[in-house]
Amino acid sequence: MSCAGRAGPARLAALALLTCSLWPARADNASQEYYTALINVTVQEPGRGAPLTFRIDRGRYGLDSPKAEVRGQVLAPLPLHGVADHLGCDPQTRFFVPPNIKQWIALLQRGNCTFKEKISRAAFHNAVAVVIYNNKSKEEPVTMTHPGTGDIIAVMITELRGKDILSYLEKNISVQMTIAVGTRMPPKNFSRGSLVFVSISFIVLMIISSAWLIFYFIQKIRYTNARDRNQRRLGDAAKKAISKLTTRTVKKGDKETDPDFDHCAVCIESYKQNDVVRILPCKHVFHKSCVDPWLSEHCTCPMCKLNILKALGIVPNLPCTDNVAFDMERLTRTQAVNRRSALGDLAGDNSLGLEPLRTSGISPLPQDGELTPRTGEINIAVTKEWFIIASFGLLSALTLCYMIIRATASLNANEVEWF
């Protein structure tokens, strides 16, 4: 597995954290208690006997508004330069107040300026209250912030109800409104401090995950370096062991030239006169040019898989890096027997001149306890550790994301808006 591949879960965790950090963009607003507003609207249409009455239960008092009951006729701003003015943000905003009206309530739409500006302009024209309807149809009323607006009452309602009332005003139909204090809604328990606590917890979890990840890479580098170092030392030992093996030149009449004699197991060619052959401790014969490269890499006989390092007594317990499947346990049990029988056969063969074994000058190699695990074992262990580390980090990111989204959903009901 490449480093880029391993970094995939880390990038995914970072992306999950970034997404969660962008989600509660407005979660910095203080969680405040608020009061609901119960609004009764009475519409007196000309030519209709009984007035039309409906109730709005989803109103909300502004944070800085007096929580009091008020009643009055609803008025909308006059058009400016022939264009309807529903926002009340222009300094030239005016209201037409009939002389017989003592108390009136301004109806304005949210947007384009702060709540404080809207409320202040209505108060300047002696409105007793301001009803601001939302500018998004699917959004609930929010708690408005408008410090310094005095004793004027400010309430927000939904866009749907606001436009219903505005439609009557545009037809010059009289609309009366009564605003009463509803229920006090306490602040939610999940506050900004809780978000900070969750964030700190996530950071701690990520630090632990990162520490494990760094430990993994250090161990991986150590395993790789140790394996490469042992392979180099094993190769050097194999070369020195090869130099201890007997070689001779095939002559006319030797048994190797007999048609019934086994061919070289490496190149599958028969032996010819003047061929240089190598005799292994197991008594198998091969072309020197064929078997030397094999022994340098595998240090075992191509036919019986005898470990020449063990057979020659150079490194008794060093396993070779032979990728061909064979029974290592069986070979270890019968190692001593094979070595004695092989050396005895070689010594009794008059056609072979076996040199005495010399082990001096060969650098000691690590024993079994010092060797690293096999490649398969390392890969299994590393894959398992990496899966745990990656899963831990990703789970931490997703857990934080879930908690922040839940916290944001709780805070949405208590959001404080300025405009």
Curated annotation (Swiss-Prot):
Compartments in which it is found: Membrane; Cytoplasm
Pathway(s) where this gene product acts: Protein modification; protein ubiquitination
Stored CDD domains: PA_GRAIL_like, RING-H2_RNF130
Membrane protein topology class: Single-pass type I membrane protein
The keyword Glycoprotein belongs to this UniProt entry's keyword annotation: yes
Extracellular-facing ranges: 28-194
Catalytic activity: S-ubiquitinyl-[E2 ubiquitin-conjugating enzyme]-L-cysteine + [acceptor protein]-L-lysine = [E2 ubiquitin-conjugating enzyme]-L-cysteine + N(6)-ubiquitinyl-[acceptor protein]-L-lysine
GO cellular component terms attached to this protein's record: cytoplasm; membrane
Record's keyword terms, sorted: Apoptosis, Cytoplasm, Glycoprotein, Membrane, Metal-binding, Phosphoprotein, Signal, Transferase, Transmembrane, Transmembrane helix, Ubl conjugation pathway, Zinc, Zinc-finger
Keyword Signal found: yes
Signal sequence interval, chain numbering: 1-27
Enzyme nomenclature, EC number: 2.3.2.27
Maturation and modification: In vivo measurements suggest this protein is glycosylated. In contrast, in vitro experiments failed to detect glycosylation.
GO-annotated biological processes: apoptotic process; programmed cell death; protein ubiquitination; ubiquitin-dependent protein catabolic process
GO molecular function: ubiquitin protein ligase activity; ubiquitin-protein transferase activity; zinc ion binding
Major subcellular location class: membrane
Zinc finger (RING-type) stretch: 264-305
Protein name, entry field: E3 ubiquitin-protein ligase RNF130
Membrane-spanning residues: 195-217
Modified residues (Phosphoserine): S341
Side Cytoplasmic, residues: 218-419
Carbohydrate-modified residues: N29, N40, N112, N135, N172, N189
PA domain boundaries: 105-176
Role according to the record: May have a role during the programmed cell death of hematopoietic cells. Acts as an E3 ubiquitin-protein ligase.
Tissue localization of expression: Ubiquitously expressed. Highly expressed in leukocytes. Not expressed in erythroblasts.
Organism: Homo sapiens (Human)
